[in-house]
Amino acid sequence: MKYFLIYISLIFCGFNTHAQINELGVFVGGVNYIGDVGPTTYIAPNEPAIGILYKWNRSPRHSYRFSYTQGSLKSKDIDSDVPSRNLRGYSFENSVKEFSAGLEFNFMDFDLHDSKTKVSPYVYSGVSYFIYDEIYILGNTSHVDYQSSTFAIPMMVGIKGRFFQNFVIGAEVGFRYTFTDNLDGSNPENDNFES
């Protein structure tokens, strides 16, 4: 089973530079995990996430977006509404660092050259490369085996606004479809575990 990572960006702030074509900002939010271990609630951040982002605004409707985000994924079967998971009792913690690039599309013109207040909903998708701990579960506790990396597809929706000349603030919610089945340690790729 592939995993969905839910990322909620509570706040990201951008400061416009170079004639309002480039944006550089910080990202503060929360993260939660959906997979084989723990609860299955899609939007329930239980750990903080931070990052930086850069946008190159090609037009009032789209921009190229590059970001770095890091956070910790934690989940416990005891927090699940599924009785079989409660009985199993697995838990894990995994550190994740993500590099992402993609296209952000604004549903309304978001022209940073215009001095008027601007607000627009948007969608974002692209490709992410992330580094995580390859873990395994032994005795209902996760253990780090080695560090690994893979790709993911981020998909996000949000709303942003510019209320001051050089300041953009927004909120978004999204998830990542990952190409690994072992963020939670339930499917280790270590040869020592094969029979």
Regions found by a protein language model. Name each.
Residues I34-T40, S84-E93, N140-D145, E194:
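Extracellular loop and loop/strand-boundary signature of outer-membrane beta-barrel proteins
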Residues M1-V26:
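Bacterial Sec-dependent N-terminal signal peptides
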Residues Q20, A44-P48, S95-F99, T117-V119, ...:
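Residues that define the transmembrane beta-barrel architecture of outer-membrane proteins
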Residues V26, I52-W56, A101-F105, S125-Y129, ...:
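Residues on the lipid-exposed face of transmembrane beta-strands in outer-membrane beta-barrel proteins
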Residues N22, P60-Y64, N166-I169:
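Repeated loop/turn-to-beta-strand initiation elements of outer-membrane beta-barrel proteins
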Residues H18-N57:
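Short glycine/proline- and aromatic-enriched beta-strand/turn motifs that initiate or cap beta-hairpins
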Residues I78, F163-S195:
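Predominantly the C-terminal beta-signal and adjacent terminal strand-loop region
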Residues P60-H62, F66-L138:
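Gram-negative (and chloroplast) outer-membrane scaffold detector with strong preference
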